[in-house]
Amino acid sequence: WIGGSSEAAIERSGKYGTGWQAAFDTPEEAGVVVEKILHAAERNSRPMDKDHFSAGFGVRFGSWEDEPVKKMAEDFEKRTGKEASRGIVVGNGDQILERIQSYVDNGVSKFILRPIGIGDEEMFEQTEQIIENVLNKSDQLLEA
């Protein structure tokens, strides 16, 4: 799997990759990259499984005012120069599922959800929330 959305990364993905990992791309931006990679793979006479496109983002059941989220958002914006909401979803399970559905609608089918918390107990609680309120409801997602 190859990551990145530069033209060079897209060409590498189409020529050598077996999948692609979005970095901080919005669902719509990821969709454009997916299409370009599929075309690059076709130009290189390579098969590319349409279910080998992924995205990862931080998730927090809570509020943007929660300390772990404020720190993560600040770090994200400082590191990337982009708005934190591109790489973090905060709220409830339905909001996380909405973001996932947006990616699915744009050709992305695999996800890395990174719980946001401080300390083992909070990380465990956030992970439990992901399992209960996202994974257990993933059958609600519609294929594009």
Predicted regions and their residues:
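Active-site-adjacent structural elements that line small-molecule/cofactor binding pockets in enzymes
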Residues: 1-144
